[in-house]
Amino acid sequence: MKIDATDAVAALSELVDAGFTHDFRIQNGKLVDVSAGLAVNPAEVTVRMKLRFETEPGSGDASNIYALEIADTGVKGFLVDAL
C-alpha cells in the first residue's frame, strides 16, 4: 500500500479509503479500539505502515500515524501520535 498524502489529514483519509477505519488510542496504558470500545492485545497487533508529518522541518512538531491490523479479527485502523 502506498500513501501519496503530504499532510496528516490527507493521509488519514487515504487510510480510511483503504479500509483502515477503526480509531485506536492509548488509554490508561492500553491500546484501545475506540470504534469498538475494546482493549486490544498488543501481541495481536501488526503495524502495516508508519507515517510521519512535520509541520516545519526541524520544528519538533510532528504527527506520527500508524496503520494497524489486528491478527485474530482482521480489524484495520489507525493510531495517531501528535508530538
Kindly give the residue locations of the regions a language model identified.
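Polybasic/polar functional segments that serve as interface/processing modules
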Residues: 1-83
